[in-house]
């Protein structure tokens, strides 16, 4: 599976996937050091400039990228390139997007507008079938889940929570279950979130508050000696 981080938040989460051998990680942002799987964009002053000046990466960074691909991004200015990047990927991959919803109370007016734009467009892409799935996670809810954390470790904890949860879902999806009651997923229900559930109390901690979810899937990891 390919993991593409776009912008600072996306790249930081993508970096967490490097600890797992199942993923090919690509990072796209400004100020990145030259390395394999990395593309450093030129700094632009406006989000639309990142879209208008986004390079063609099909023959370089994206060469050989096909199959299941997850694009991770948020509302930073570099996210202005996300639609152009999806255009370059759409005929090569089965694309899903993980969108990190920021704390709206701390956003500037310009970033708030960018958040609304990208968030709404991604939802339309999911509903129209351009995306296999749109995962939405909310920084405010994630903050509540990780609890009291030293400032220096705050975003590291959140990024690790997101990446490890997604990784475990991929592991479950590609492992034979001892028992399952899954039905075929609803094809038109492509906007999703992630969450954790306490096995004993059944308390659910969702990463984003979806309006009227149409389907839920629960994965239980039970030690073999208990089975």
Language model features: what each stretch is:
Residues 1-227:
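Tubulin/FtsZ superfamily GTPase core signature
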């Amino acid at each position: 599976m390919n993991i593409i981080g776009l912008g600072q938040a996306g790249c930081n989460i993508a970096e967490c996937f490097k600890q797992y051998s199942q993923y090919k990680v690509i990072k796209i942002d400004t100020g990145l050091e030259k390395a394999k799987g990395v593309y450093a964009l030129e700094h632009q002053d406006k989000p639309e400039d990142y879209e208008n000046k986004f390079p063609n990466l099909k023959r370089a960074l994206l060469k050989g990228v096909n199959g299941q691909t997850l694009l991770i991004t948020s509302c930073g200015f570099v996210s202005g390139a996300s639609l152009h990047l999806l255009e370059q990927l759409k005929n090569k991959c089965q694309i899903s997007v993980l969108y990190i919803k920021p704390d709206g109370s701390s956003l500037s007016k310009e970033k708030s507008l960018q958040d609304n734009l990208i968030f709404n467009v991604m939802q339309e892409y999911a509903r129209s079938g351009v995306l296999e799935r749109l995962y939405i996670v909310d920084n405010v809810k994630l903050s509540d889940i990780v609890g009291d954390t030293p400032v220096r470790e705050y975003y590291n904890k959140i990024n690790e929570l997101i990446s490890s949860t997604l990784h475990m879902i991929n592991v479950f999806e590609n492992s034979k279950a001892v028992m399952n009651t899954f039905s075929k997923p609803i094809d038109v229900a492509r906007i999703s979130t992630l969450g954790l559930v306490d096995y004993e109390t059944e308390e659910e901690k969702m990463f984003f508050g979806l309006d009227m979810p149409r389907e839920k899937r629960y994965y239980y990891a039970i030690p073999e000696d208990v089975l």
